[in-house]
Amino acid sequence: MSYSHRVTQLTGITSARLAETDGLSAVTIAAAAAVGMSPYGPPVVRSGPKGTVTCLLCHGGHVITHVIAEQSLCIVDILALAPGDPERGIDVIAKRLKGQKQER
């Protein structure tokens, strides 16, 4: 069984956009669709003193965002079984949140 896993930091996103949990839920669903994954259910969103996490568990992978809105920080974590391409999901999230991928 083959899979791909990508973790990317997005920059240039306004803190107001990152503070919208409904918007974060919507982009995780859109990212999963772009990768070709079907969700098990709705995204789970949890907020705490170190930011907000949105997690979408899917058949064949996951889409997770880790956000600290006050710092305009968004880390995207996508795992997909082949032939899914996590980069497609990251591109969808970057486009919808109006962020730029920070290459390592």
List the predicted regions and their residue ranges:
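Polybasic/polar functional segments that serve as interface/processing modules
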Residues: 1-104
